[in-house]
Structures are given as C-alpha cells and as structure tokens.
UniProtKB/Swiss-Prot annotation:
EC number: 2.7.1.39
GO cellular component: cytoplasm
Family note: Belongs to the GHMP kinase family. Homoserine kinase subfamily.
Highest taxon in the source lineage: Bacteria
Residues that coordinate or bind ATP: 84-94
Subcellular location, record wording: Cytoplasm
Catalytic reaction list: L-homoserine + ATP = O-phospho-L-homoserine + ADP + H(+)
Protein name (record): Homoserine kinase
Annotated pathway: Amino-acid biosynthesis; L-threonine biosynthesis; L-threonine from L-aspartate: step 4/5
SUPFAM superfamilies the record matches: GHMP Kinase, C-terminal domain, Ribosomal protein S5 domain 2-like
GO molecular function terms attached to this record: ATP binding; homoserine kinase activity
Pfam families associated with the record: GHMP_kinases_C (PF08544), GHMP_kinases_N (PF00288)
Amino acid sequence: MKILVPATSANLGPGFDCLGLSLKLFNETQIQKSGVFSISIGGEGSDNIFLKKNNIFVNIFYEIYEKLSGKKDNFRFIFQNNIPLSRGLGSSSAVIVGAIASAYYMSGFKVEKKRILDEALIYENHPDNIAPATLGGFVCSLVEKNKVYSIKKEIDKDLAAVVVIPNLAMSTEQSRQALAKNLSFNDAVFNLSHASFLTACFLEKKYEFLKFASQDKLHEINRMKNLPELFEVQKFALENKALMSTLSGSGSSFFSLAFKDDALALAKKMQTKFKDFSVQYLEFDDNGFEIC
C-alpha cells in the first residue's frame, strides 16, 4: 500500500488550535509485508539515524495494527518525506494520521476519516493540524468529550500559498513555552472576534477582509521574537498583494495566501529578498490523506 498525507498550516493567525488548512506538499509512505522488518527514509530526516531507531510512524502503526489484527507481522516501510521537520507545517500530524490510517488499512478494517481523526487526537491533543491532514481543505475544529468535530470548506482554486521556510527547527513544545501565561479580557475578545470573522471570510469568499481578520494577539508576536526576520517577512508579504500572512502553526515557517498570479509573483520576490530562507509556492489540497 501507499499513503499520501499533506502538509498543513494551522492557527492562521487568531484561530489558535482550531483553524487549519491543507497544502499540496505530501509525505509518501509505502508499506509492504516482509519476512524481516526494515525502514528506508528519503527526503527530510534521511540523515537522522534516530528516525530509524525510534520512528514515531512505525511505533504508532504497530501499536494500532497489533491491537486491531492481533498479529505481530514484519513490514517494510519506505518513507519519502517532503514536509520539512519542525517548521510549523504539520510534519508530526502527517506522521500520526498516516500511521493510524495505514494500520487500519493493513489490518483489513474500513478506513473511516472520522475514526482516524478521533484516534489521532490521542497522539496530538489539538485538532488544528490533524483535521486538515485528514480531511483536506480549510477546516474549523473543536474537541468535545475526546472527539473531534470539524467543518470543512474547499478552498477556492484561484488561491495559492507562499510558504517561507527558515533554516530553524522549532518544536511545538518549545514554541508553546514562549506564550504568555495570562491573557487580558480585551485580547481574548479580539481573538474570538477575529477567528470567527476569518472563518466567515473563507466560507463566504470575502477575501478582501482577510488582511485584518487574520490578526492575532494570543501567540504570534511572542513566537516570532525567536526569529525577528519573520516580522519583515509578514510586512513584505502584505505590501506585495498577500491577502493574509501569518505564522504557520508554531513556526518557524510563515504562510501567506494570495490569488495565484499574485502568489507566483510574491514567491519570486520573497526568494530574492530573503535569500537565507526557502520559499515555496504551493496550491491547496482538498482531499486530506489518500491511500493508493
């Protein structure tokens, strides 16, 4: 079997831990029954020996496969990782969702996306990345009694993303330590209103309001202080026809959204201006993970 799982960009400014969308940048994993266990890694992490010794995908896969099938079989895992690691593009969510869905498939069970999403919550307790990795599109989610409830909206085909990827790993755990311990009532209301309005902009295609709807007072500034150049990335994007520009997840990547022609032009300008960073033009994925 082969499974493709997309990269994701979460939070989107004010939608902390609840908003996210799916990008056409995929991790590809092939799994085959084998006489002996083996792992092959290409792309991101291929030079990391620890990913072969203690692989999270493999660990989750076997945990669920053995629970579902009652068997202890050997498999050959072939990873082609295209999602940058620890850059705020959902690499951990792609691993979790991919492992769970693969285990269900290889155990002979029906792969139901709602079930996969609920089970993924066990391994990542906020749905902002795992939901779009599972469902695709723009997704608004909440958690109630250990279950994920999501509403998905397909993203307009006229839009595209420009993602700026610094050469700085930033784990979610590390990034959360930078967050303020207390939040004022006014700032809480600010984020609630902006996250709600941002969601409505995507649902109703009111893209002209995204620039101010995507503002945040909860997490972005504190996280961006770890890499001050990101403030310039955001300013430059908004001055060059980006409809919105936000920290991607916990960082260090930065996500900008624009109409396709503007996004292509912005990507070229970004690459020229920010020579030390990788810049990718990406279209949006509306399917979530797919088993081939």
